[in-house]
Amino acid sequence: MRGKYKFYIWIVGFVSMFLHGKTDAQQALYPLLEKKSWSQVLEENEYKWHPPYTINLLIHPLHSSDWIYLNPSMVVSRRHVIRNISSTNFEQRKKAESQEDLVVQFAFDNPPFIPDFRLTNLRLAEDKYPVATADYFANDIYYKIEYAATVLDDSQTLLCLRVGAKNESDKIKQIMIRSKIGYYSENKMFDYHYIPYRWTNEKWKDYDQVVLKEHSIYKGQQLIGEVVSENMNLFWEEKKSYTDKEYEDILYPQVWYGSGYVTPEFRVKDMHRVVCAMKEVQPNDSAFFVLKLLVNDSLITSFHEESLKQLTFKDVKEKAIADFKVPFTDKTLKTEFKRDEWEDLFCSLQLSTLQLLVNDFQNKMYQPAQGGSSERFFVWVFEAVQMLRPMLRTGQFESVKKSLDYIFSLQDAGFPPVGKFTTTSGAIGTTGPRWANTTGMALALACDYYLYSKDQQFMEDYLSKILKAVHWILGEIKATRVLNSDGSRPLTYGLMPFAVASDGDAGYFVSATDIFSFWGLEKAVLFLESIRHAEAVSMRKELEQYRSDLLFTIKHLAQPNGYIDRKITTDDSNVQEAIKFINTDIMAPIATVGIISPESELFKKYIDYYENNVAVDYFMGKMDREIFYIIQCEHYWQPIYLMLGEWKKAFMTLQTCLKYGMSHDAHQTQERFNLRNPAFAPWQPNGSGNGRIIDMMLNALYFENKD
């Protein structure tokens, strides 16, 4: 009997795990959290998985279109942001993805190797400014590279690297560092940003257009850089090859001491056209050289060349840090966090966001990029608003205003949302996938901007644009107030029509389309009421009708077990649903934005269902057994828990994001987290992730419930 009983328990457990997607190591913990003491909660707030690596650390000046990436292989690259292109324009997209990128790599020692990214350390200046240091240790040599970039003018940035090594052995050692400078097609050098990071010797690609002449670096006939020795011998190495035996011959005694053995994937056996720096170094002594590059090789002037020669690494580093301090003034939010490095994090997240706002020098506005790498050219207005609204709370009004100028430039500009609309006149478009919620999101940001800034000129300039956007939403929801032929009321009554809801969903998706259309409409009504606009009264009635129609549908989407479906099921053959978005684009925001009270019985049942059947550990955005859509869902739930006075649950939503929603050495946020693979860091850095964490940090200090 005992054996049969054990088998029965096993099979029941397996079926339960299959149905609910949990294992013993990943149980939902929220239901019991409020019953625990704070000491128990704090004890439980430990690391169970490895935080993500910093994969893409941006170090370029604020608002530059020449993004400069530092990766954990100590590689630095310049990748241009081509502005105002559409994700639906194949030719534009192909051109952007195959553009020529500047890439600078380093190989250490002799025979040479590239660093194993899992063994490097990255740091920010003062732990918050994107002036970076990367270091590595192998064969008793400590390698350290400092990276800084400063703007010279609207078209040019100077990148400056101080490269050094220290002999930490007890005997004289030859230090050798090779620098490979090349320009490569982006889609041939860099992987798509949903692919886990890797960097092996296959990335060490030949490039024959760069040459060193004395201390000047040329691309063809164009001066692009300079190398300066502090105490190393510098020379151009045209060609040199090594064999695996040469690497294996130095296997011992290195492995006895645990440092320096180079596995095959990091060996660079064929050297072609590199800058070589070499020096015999005494124990505990160091050797250095400086590498300077003009990152935009297509727009180099005599002024740029003169600056290249005159500016030292110290000059560039000091100016870079000074420029990163500029946004923080007496008119912006000041905080004083005493624990957990919150002060540094709060600064870093704001600077990362400002780096993602790309300056259009002609039109004087900022294109709000979502970040990442492969799709940095496109604007998702939904994500841009999540990135920018919290910046209003920090007082960064100018940057938000210039970004609003860009977002509203997409109104009636040829980038409309896609759906079965009566018209798109007045709608706000987007250059990324054409989500239907962009107009509501743009309204939310614009109206909150006025609420925070009281910018009267903005009100005068934007009133007509806001009204056009409001009338578009109202026109579309009025058009669906049609009964069925038998006189019954469809669930689509009074809601937004069939539309593209997200990157993977199309149909009647209340979760993505209606919730945020309502949110923007409500913000607009509050704005119009605050300025006593003539249409405010009638629009308030329309808003409440929309709320009523939404509540009718939501009650019918709610199931007996508490689950609320995110979409209205119809027989339309064009419906698309990304199954892995079911637990990411969720119905929780109906309470976050105020469509329904979180204390209502319907929503309490939803909370119970979600905590027991969807949440895993303290993650709220499960995609599968390993991967979680991080920060977004936790950001939805934190204010709900605060409204309910469930402080420990609110605490854990933020702590989960701080632990697993970003890298810890350089505070780089990302879209998803993989329990097993910290090198999986898609969309890093992540603009909306920055904003949501800033929002949650501020909510933890001060939360204002409109009721």
Regions from the PLM with identified roles:
Residues 1-26:
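Bacterial Sec-dependent N-terminal signal peptides
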Residues 25-337, 706-707:
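Terminal accessory carbohydrate-recognition/targeting modules of carbohydrate-active enzymes
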Residues 120-133, 331-373, 604-605:
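Conserved oxyanion/phosphate-binding beta-strand-loop segments in alpha/beta enzyme cores
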Residues 124, 128, 364-371, 392-498, ...:
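Helix-terminus loop motifs that line ligand-binding clefts
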Residues 223, 227, 232-242, 247, ...:
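Active-site acid/base region of carbohydrate-active enzymes
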Residues 268-269, 279-281, 291, 317, ...:
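Extracellular glycan-targeting catalytic surfaces
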Residues 270-282, 286-313, 372-376, 419-441, ...:
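The feature captures the catalytic groove of carbohydrate-active enzymes
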Residues 377-401, 405-412, 464, 471, ...:
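Active-site core of glycosidic bond-cleaving carbohydrate-active enzymes
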